[in-house]
């Protein structure tokens, strides 16, 4: 499929400097228009001192990529996007290392930088962005620790959740991670809220005590009934929807806690903000985004360790595997919430096991 915006084709050239140290070819996907991918062949990168080269074996779709980029929030003049974009949930095997901190043959989660996304067969990275994982278990399951690790950071901002009633609005990969972790940490009640039946079922499997189907019942009345009139101590917005912020303000009890994780694609706007509710509830509102902290990898590393010892398994959130060549299908599945998708992984270079 050709580039739909030929006037900006030259922008791609400026973005290729990352790949200039090379001797072989790799395949990478990129967005050339809203909701439209194609593949490009690029020179394979070679690490310099202090870097390692990783063969990517599993890439996963993130909701923020869908809401913030895939649906067309990017200005038209920025297309085509850089190779590999949008994707930041990736894992693979170190095939060449020029740093004492990383060993060839080690599997790892990788956080891409330098404008390069994860929809690529290979990339190079510095050790601070490469997070080793054990050599057992499927790499397509270990990659789930990336997004659940970001949730681990957010859950820590809640303080002690033991004995608390918690509602999580949205039960995609992020929302389900909140349901799983807060239950593990001793929450008295965890209510998963989502219109998709498959996601509500998964919520009950991994820790939620109750679920609410907002398309079928009055969400606020259902929560009132489920809590016996006690209300929600902590509410989480994991929707990626501009309506989510206001809905959470209505859900949380007076003087409760509202944890905002959601990133929307509507230029950051909040829809139907309930100002009266905001003033009356006087809730503590905590925006959480681990990527904006000084230690963006700390909680992901901790999540890897927690999975390794069996405390919690983010791998349970993976619902589908597709081939790398089916990148368009993978993003469409996530966007449409079709086939009961929760987290879809693309197997790259024969990965997925």
Give a label for each model feature.
Residues 16-25, 229, 259, 266-267, ...:
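C-terminal capping/lid region of NAD(P)-dependent oxidoreductase domains
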Residues 51, 106-107, 122, 165, ...:
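Residue-level marker of beta-strand positions
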Residues 161, 206-283, 353:
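Glycine-rich cofactor phosphate-binding loops and adjacent beta1-alpha1 units
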Residues 269-319, 328-329:
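C-terminal substrate-binding/catalytic core of Rossmann-like NAD(P)-dependent dehydrogenases/reductases
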Residues 120, 231-232, 327:
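Local beta-strand N-terminus motif with an aromatic residue
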Residues 141-217, 221:
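Mid-domain Rossmann-like dinucleotide-binding core that forms the NAD(H)/NADP(H) cofactor-binding site
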Residues 45-60, 73-114:
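Glycine-rich beta-strand-centered segment in the early N-terminal region that forms part
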Residues 88, 108-169:
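NAD(P)H dinucleotide-binding glycine-rich loop of Rossmann-like/cofactor-binding domains
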